[in-house]
Amino acid sequence: MLNETVLAPLHREIGGKMVDFGGWDMPLHYGSQVEEHQKVRTDAGMFDVSHMTVVDVTGAGAKTFLQYVLANDVAKLTKNGKALYSGMLNHEGGVVDDLIVYLMEWGYRVVVNCATREKDLAWMVEHAKGFEVALNERDDLAMIAVQGPAAREKTAQILPELLTMDLDIFQGADVAALGDVTFFVARTGYTGEDGYEIMLPTSDADAFWRALMAVGVAPCGLGARDTLRLEAGMNLYGHEMDDNTSPLVANMAWTIAWQPEERNFIGREAISAEKAAGVTHKLVGLVLQDRGVLRAEQVVTCEGVEGEGVITSGTFSPTLSKSVALARVPVAFSGECTVAVRNKQLKALVVKPSFVRLGKALV
């Protein structure tokens, strides 16, 4: 039996094509994945991301606990509502999950992936022992992401308090909604466009989704969410990183807070040793020069360079009208490479792992 978000009946009502996603019955699209993708790049689209796991972390030891279990340092968060992206590492330096943590007036709010929910919760509970901390999973909250160049303006038609806030990127705040209800609205996303991710009581989710539709925000499924994040060069857990992949080879080195040196976070010793020995692989972008489509697990080679790489995520880019991919390759890979696609050797260009941001092509 698949899990469902509170919005599942509404997705079916408006024609959502439902599929199994990490044990959740979620909309893949509502008719055209490409049209939904383009809507987010040019106007505004919305995604039901209520399958994500929200955990509130409270108690006198909340900060020191998160400084221990996260590779990034929550001490960087000094303003309520501010967000931080981090990996949560295991003792071998692999990535248990990637997540966002918000500083709240009462503690911290952590948002982790749905597919890793059980593993993440067990990991956090196990390592909370010895800390004065409480972990509270917020299954009473839904989450809706509104993304695109018109996302903020259209959301403010329903939540007018946003007009006076002018939230910075990676900043959230409680926003007055209907009656005495408040929604937590953060200027974050997973598409490479501006917009909001909104956490709200499950009881308000249906009405809020319909209100967004009424002001012209297009319902979008997980298919478009994946092509958008891939164009933006954003990692997907289980593809670009996992329990056996170091953040140093997953384009996540920037999320590691090495200072102060005395902060002993889980995985520090392992990735410090890896860094000292010299990282052997890197995450790159690939842009296909020939006809075809790049897909995960295809093998990548580069003339004159020993070893081979592998595509971690690949797709046809609706924005660029060509196939793009993220790939883990030996550090010496650069310039032109070759990808094995259906017994053919196709040419691809190695680029930085980001293809489109704010509607503009970067390659």
UniProtKB/Swiss-Prot annotation:
Task: Give, as one word, the top-level EC class.
Answer: transferase
Give the Gene Ontology MF terms in alphabetical order.
aminomethyltransferase activity; transaminase activity
Report the GO terms under cellular component: cytosol; glycine cleavage complex
**Alphabetical list of InterPro entries matching this protein:** GCS_T, GCS_T_bac, GCST_C, GCV_T_N, GcvT/YgfZ/DmdA, GcvT/YgfZ_C, TrmE/GcvT_dom1
Which reactions is this enzyme annotated as catalysing?
A: N(6)-[(R)-S(8)-aminomethyldihydrolipoyl]-L-lysyl-[protein] + (6S)-5,6,7,8-tetrahydrofolate = N(6)-[(R)-dihydrolipoyl]-L-lysyl-[protein] + (6R)-5,10-methylene-5,6,7,8-tetrahydrofolate + NH4(+)
EC number(s) recorded for this UniProt protein: 2.1.2.10
Q: Which GO terms describe its biological process?
A: glycine decarboxylation via glycine cleavage system
Keyword annotations for this protein, in alphabetical order, are: Aminotransferase, Transferase
Subunit structure and binding partners: The glycine cleavage system is composed of four proteins: P, T, L and H.
Query: Its function?
Result: The glycine cleavage system catalyzes the degradation of glycine.
Q: Which family does it belong to?
A: Belongs to the GcvT family.
Instruction: Report what the protein is called.
Output: Aminomethyltransferase
List the gene name. Answer: gcvT
